[in-house]
Amino acid sequence: MNGDPAENRARLYLWWSRLAAMTAKELIQFGRDTLLLVAIAYLFVFDTYMAGNVSMQLNHAVVVVHDADHSAASRELIYHFRPPHFRLGGEVQDHRAGQRLLDQGQALVVLDIPPHFERDILQGKPTDVQVQVDASNTVLGFLASSYAAQIIGQYGFDQALARLGVTERSMQNVPMIRDEHRVWYNPNQKDAWFMPIVELLIVITIMAIMLPAAAAVREKERGTIEQLLVSPLTPIQILLPKVIAMTLVILLGTAVSLFFVLHGIFDVPMKGSLALFFAVTTLYTFTTAGLGLYIATLSRNLAQAAMLAILVLMPMIFLSGAWTPPEAMPAGMREAMFLSPLYHFIEMGYGILLKGAGLDVLWDSLLSLVLLGIVIFSFGVWRFKRQFG
């Protein structure tokens, strides 16, 4: 600004007062939208709560048995398929009955014990036990197959030792490699620590895109955007209050979810700096709000904005590492993950909340998010100014 310093201060004061007034207007409008308030409360509270109750572990998977031997050895093997991982769902008379239960989804595992199972073990002959697993759910199928193989393998090992006359006392003189491992950051490997954090960060992403887009599109639908454009307000003074107001709402929802759901209910530790986490969340919200502004310039109504938001959200989530670890993805998709702001946000979220990491560890993720934020938010502002400026 050039000219008299007092005049420049007055202009600056006027600029910021208009920005504050527009932000207050956005917050008031938001507070009057009961349906939107309920939706946000649901996502930040009940959605994260439900995510914390989702388990990726194998618990009480139904096992049905076709026991063609009916011996003490077969009953002993069946006994090992017990809770918490498995539960016995009954016996079937033939292979086809077990296959039907797999087809109908009434069993996850069918254990098929052949005739002469006990006789072959006592005579030292090799014997086969067939395990059929429903792997339509890949994760559960893999876990069930792994646990079943471990149970059968251990049972066979114990039988071999017994046949060789090896006792538990004599085993103490055999050199063994002991597994001494330590699990960091989530010692009990609780899904209730992992799942709600992921869900919270995804909810923040959804809100950061949808709320600014919905606010701008609502102005277009009501025709009030034209009234704002003929006012003394600049396009920046029109769009920034929407982003600032929705960022404040998201930060409030995040705080409620963190303190009352994640920490209060699921006892998720908050080892790092909460100030750093909220600062990163603010930066991330502005970054993804740029996508919301871009969506608003392409949409004529809220339905179009919602559809376009889904088109943007799904690649961001798939490329974030929230559902699939980067190591399990093809090389090309691993490279594309660095273009997803959510990927860097999740890295920092886990680092701060579970690991207690600071900027000395997370600086590269923060730098990537800053660079993406500059590009995405600037592009959204440019599109908004081009359409409404």
Model segments located where?
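Extracytoplasmic/periplasmic domains immediately adjacent to an N-terminal transmembrane anchor
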Residues: M1-W193, V361
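Membrane-interfacial helix-loop-helix junctions in multi-pass membrane proteins
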Residues: R96, Y185-Q189, G321-I376
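Transmembrane helix boundary and interhelical loop/hinge segments in multi-pass membrane proteins
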Residues: G105, I209-S231, V243, F388-G389
